[in-house]
């Protein structure tokens, strides 16, 4: 088929449509949507589209990762992560470092075996391990939501904090090791200084620029409210770029800036959250498709045996060992079952594949082998861990039903209103015990019925309104004082 502008748009539309339907199928069957997105990209790459530009894939990945990390930061609430802040930070820093070290040493040992078809020196082995040392919990929580599950012992916020904040550490390890290879060796002091500068500058820039974004959103008077989300999006990219120019970690800055915005009062919060959520999904799909198009399945199969051994080592030994060592100082605060579950949720996602493009673009010897191994292990992790998360949670007795949030009416109150909205469905038991009119409901002091939904009809509430089984009442009440 001749690739005209119209045909490119058509192919792009088909890719997005197929991906959306694949995501729906994945959600229904409790499988990671990422796995199907990658599969769609690989399928189109085999027959219809020729794409082999690692720099373009890296650029798409960087843009997508900025949006994903910022959105993840906005969803991270200080009140939820405060009890598990210490273990979460330890896992996202030392956990990544230990996983990279253990896996890198195993790859180096494996490279020395005569029967393997890869022979990587120590630093390159550590580089390979570093690219896939961070976790991706976004797919995990999509699975838990699809099966209406939650987690005990504050595991959910701890895993969210780890997954949102460990990408910067893996990125720094990857960049430093690439620089080490290209410069024929760097001193320990240089490596340590690079880490310190990236962390300090990244954290400071994220905090300050996050504060600036809040100030701009609340003080800048824009006539068209649709421009507020676009203003925030520009801040996301500005934060990443300016931090990188100052030799800081742009990904860390973006995540912290997202946390600042998400935990403070801002204008048009609902519109901004809706915009960012849709944009996050769009760029996740584009990123996964792009990475799926980039891989050559034939080259990936050539390293399948070695990649399988490395992947099994990471899942069974590398990740659990690093988790248990990192959580050792916290003693009985985190029980054994929780440690086992955290070890199992070492899910690899798109981020390792993005980081695997850095050695390719930098021209590191053996970069193609690194990319293919990382891609294979990502698929392996999604198939083995991604499809069994809910089963493992149930087996360990850590799953609980997910509490309902929001209401079925799609109504939200501004942050400044100190009230809660919730909906109640009328049952036969309610009618038998309280009565069949609205005035018989005997609602608590300070609670009012705003509207009644009966089928597709909305009714204005009054005391004499006869209630039917299945009616939904939208209630507004004062927030509980803590």
Feature-to-residue mapping (PLM):
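The feature marks cytosolic C-terminal regulatory regions of anion transporters and related permeases
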Residues: 408-410, 422-423, 457-462
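Transmembrane helical cores of multi-pass secondary ion antiporters/exchangers
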Residues: 1-402, 406, 416, 429
């Amino acid at each position: 088929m001749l690739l005209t502008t119209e045909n490119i748009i058509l192919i792009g539309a088909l890719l997005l449509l197929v991906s959306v339907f694949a995501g729906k199928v994945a959600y229904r069957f409790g499988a990671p949507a990422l796995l199907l997105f990658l599969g769609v990209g690989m399928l189109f790459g085999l027959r219809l589209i020729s794409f082999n530009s690692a720099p373009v894939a890296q650029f798409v990945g960087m843009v997508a990762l900025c949006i994903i990390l910022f959105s993840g930061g906005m969803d991270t609430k200080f009140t939820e992560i405060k009890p598990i802040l210490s273990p979460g930070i330890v896992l996202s820093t030392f956990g990544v470092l230990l996983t990279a070290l253990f896996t890198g040493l195993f790859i180096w040992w494996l490279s020395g075996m005569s029967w393997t078809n890869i022979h990587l020196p120590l630093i390159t082995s550590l580089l390979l391990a570093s690219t896939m040392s961070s976790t991706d919990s976004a797919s995990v929580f999509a699975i838990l939501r699809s099966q209406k599950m939650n987690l005990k012992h504050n595991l959910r916020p701890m895993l969210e904090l780890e997954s949102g904040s460990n990408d910067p550490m893996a990125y720094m390890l990857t960049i430093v090791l690439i620089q080490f290879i290209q410069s024929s060796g760097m001193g320990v002091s240089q490596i340590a200084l690079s880490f310190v500068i990236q962390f300090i500058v990244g954290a400071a820039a994220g905090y300050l620029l996050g504060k600036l974004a809040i100030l701009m959103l609340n003080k800048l008077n824009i006539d068209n409210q649709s421009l507020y989300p676009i203003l925030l999006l520009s801040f996301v990219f500005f934060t990443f770029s300016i931090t990188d120019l100052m030799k800081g970690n742009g990904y860390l800055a973006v995540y912290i800036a997202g946390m600042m915005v998400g935990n403070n009062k801002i204008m048009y919060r609902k519109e901004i959250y809706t915009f960012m959520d849709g944009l996050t999904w769009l760029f996740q799909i584009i990123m996964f498709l792009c990475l799926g198009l980039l891989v050559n399945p034939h080259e990936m199969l050539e390293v399948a045996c070695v990649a399988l051994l490395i992947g099994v080592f990471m899942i069974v030994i590398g990740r659990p060992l690093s988790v248990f060592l990192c959580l050792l100082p916290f003693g009985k605060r985190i029980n054994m079952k929780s440690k086992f579950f955290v070890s199992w949720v070492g899910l690899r996602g798109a981020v390792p594949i993005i980081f695997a493009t850095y050695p390719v673009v930098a021209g590191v010897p053996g970069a193609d082998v690194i990319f293919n191994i990382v891609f294979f292990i990502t698929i392996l992790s999604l198939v083995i861990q991604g499809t069994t998360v809910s089963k493992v949670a149930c087996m360990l007795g850590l799953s609980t039903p997910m509490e309902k949030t929001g209401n079925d009416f799609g109504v939200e109150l501004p942050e400044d209103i100190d009230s809660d909205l919730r909906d109640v469905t009328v049952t036969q038991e309610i009618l038998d015990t309280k009565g069949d009119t609205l005035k018989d409901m005997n609602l608590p002091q300070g609670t009012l019925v705003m509207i009644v939904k009966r089928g597709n009809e909305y009714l204005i509430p009054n005391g004499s309104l006869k209630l039917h089984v299945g009616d939904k009442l939208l209630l507004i009440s004062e927030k509980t004082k803590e």
